[in-house]
């Protein structure tokens, strides 16, 4: 949509929600709402609870900017509701959102498209592990959580049992993944075009929830100090992943880089927009202010039928 058209519509920023990432979503949503207000849009903030359909109807929303993270916001649920309500929205559609939120489905899609990803096995609550368990160390993850919630790095059977117990506190489906030692990098993709690569260097050694959202806990190298050929290959791979999943608007693709290559870890279809978030940092590196980034994402709002 054009800027002039959007400035005549009622825009809702959907934030908060019901997931374990609620607090991060509120920070993302507030930052987006303030940016849109500065740019002259009519903005309503909506805390997306179970009464979201009623809130949308009551406020007369015409366009939705989705600033939700985690379940019921990033997994296709809200996207489906907005499709039913005929309200254009930002970001990826129902299927891409659902695929990217499910780490197991994402891994299978990456394998299908020949995109390198760490070896893995899958476990459902009360069942045996499906697939061959990679060698230790391993990373144990709830399949449908974000912000590193419920993740453990394990080195033996005892730690694996504890890691599975923690992961099952958050999900009935768990991904057990080969641990890749290397440099963690992230590539933002905006409307199908890659942004500069950021290398993530957490001071604690592991990029956990605290490192992500506490200022000063992580060093960000922008642009990532990588050989030119590798840098270009990572950007190309990020776009391939974006297209394979079927993403729209803005997304972020995370990789581990080793001496022998790189591996795709996961895809984030609603990247954070807080003061420590990576997508705004990458956009700023190419001269795009936070407000301009928010407007660019808003301009892509549509129905994904």
UniProtKB/Swiss-Prot annotation:
Binding site for ATP: 134-186
Enzyme class: ligase
Any single biological process term in GO: regulation of cell shape
The ATP-grasp domain, residue ranges: 107-299
EC number: 6.3.2.4
Keywords: ATP-binding, Cell shape, Cell wall biogenesis/degradation, Cytoplasm, Ligase, Magnesium, Manganese, Metal-binding, Nucleotide-binding, Peptidoglycan synthesis
Pfam families linked: Dala_Dala_lig_C (PF07478), Dala_Dala_lig_N (PF01820)
Pathway: Cell wall biogenesis; peptidoglycan biosynthesis
Listed GO MF terms: ATP binding; D-alanine-D-alanine ligase activity; metal ion binding
UniProt subcellular location: Cytoplasm
InterPro entries with a match to the protein in the record: ATP-grasp, ATP_grasp_subdomain_1, D-Ala_lig_Van_CS, D_ala_D_ala, Dala_Dala_lig_C, Dala_Dala_lig_N, PreATP-grasp_dom_sf
Catalytic reaction list: 2 D-alanine + ATP = D-alanyl-D-alanine + ADP + phosphate + H(+)
Matches recorded under Gene3D superfamilies: 3.40.50.20, ATP-grasp fold, A domain (3.30.1490.20), ATP-grasp fold, B domain (3.30.470.20)
Binding site for Mg(2+) 2: 266, 268
Residues at which Mg(2+) 1 binds: 254, 266
GO cellular component: cytoplasm
Cofactor note: Binds 2 magnesium or manganese ions per subunit.
Family affiliation: Belongs to the D-alanine--D-alanine ligase family.
Function: Cell wall formation.
PANTHER family per record: D-ALANINE--D-ALANINE LIGASE (PTHR23132), D-ALANINE--D-ALANINE LIGASE B (PTHR23132:SF23)
UniProt name for this protein: D-alanine--D-alanine ligase
Annotated source species: Syntrophotalea carbinolica (strain DSM 2380 / NBRC 103641 / GraBd1) (Pelobacter carbinolicus)
């Amino acid at each position: 949509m054009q800027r002039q058209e959007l400035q005549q519509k009622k825009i809702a920023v959907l934030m908060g929600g019901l997931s374990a990432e609620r607090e991060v979503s509120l920070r993302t949503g507030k930052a987006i709402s303030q940016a849109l207000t500065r740019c002259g849009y009519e903005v309503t903030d909506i805390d997306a609870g179970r009464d979201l359909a009623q809130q949308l109807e009551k406020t007369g929303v015409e366009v939705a900017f989705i600033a939700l993270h985690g379940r019921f916001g990033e997994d296709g649920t809200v996207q489906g509701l907005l499709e039913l309500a005929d309200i254009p929205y930002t970001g990826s559609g129902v299927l891409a959102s659902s695929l990217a939120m499910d780490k197991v489905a994402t891994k299978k899609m990456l394998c299908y498209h020949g995109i390198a990803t760490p070896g893995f096995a899958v476990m459902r609550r009360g069942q045996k592990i499906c697939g061959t368990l990679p060698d230790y160390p391993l990373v144990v993850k709830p399949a449908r959580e974000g912000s590193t919630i419920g993740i453990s790095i394990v080195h033996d059977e005892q730690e694996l049992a504890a890691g599975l117990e923690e992961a099952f506190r958050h999900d009935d489906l768990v991904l057990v993944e080969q641990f890749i030692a290397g440099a963690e990098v992230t590539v933002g993709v905006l409307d199908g075009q890659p942004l500069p690569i950021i290398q993530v260097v957490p001071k604690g050694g592991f990029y956990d929830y605290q490192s992500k959202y506490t200022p000063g806990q992580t060093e960000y190298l922008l642009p990532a100090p990588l050989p030119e050929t590798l840098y270009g290959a990572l950007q190309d791979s990020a776009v391939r992943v974006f297209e394979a999943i079927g993403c729209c608007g803005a997304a972020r693709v995370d990789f581990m880089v080793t001496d022998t290559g790189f591996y795709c870890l996961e895809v984030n279809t609603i990247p954070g927009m807080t003061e420590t978030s990576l997508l705004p940092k990458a956009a700023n590196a190419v001269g795009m202010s936070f407000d301009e980034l928010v407007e660019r994402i808003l301009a892509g709002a549509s129905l994904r039928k």
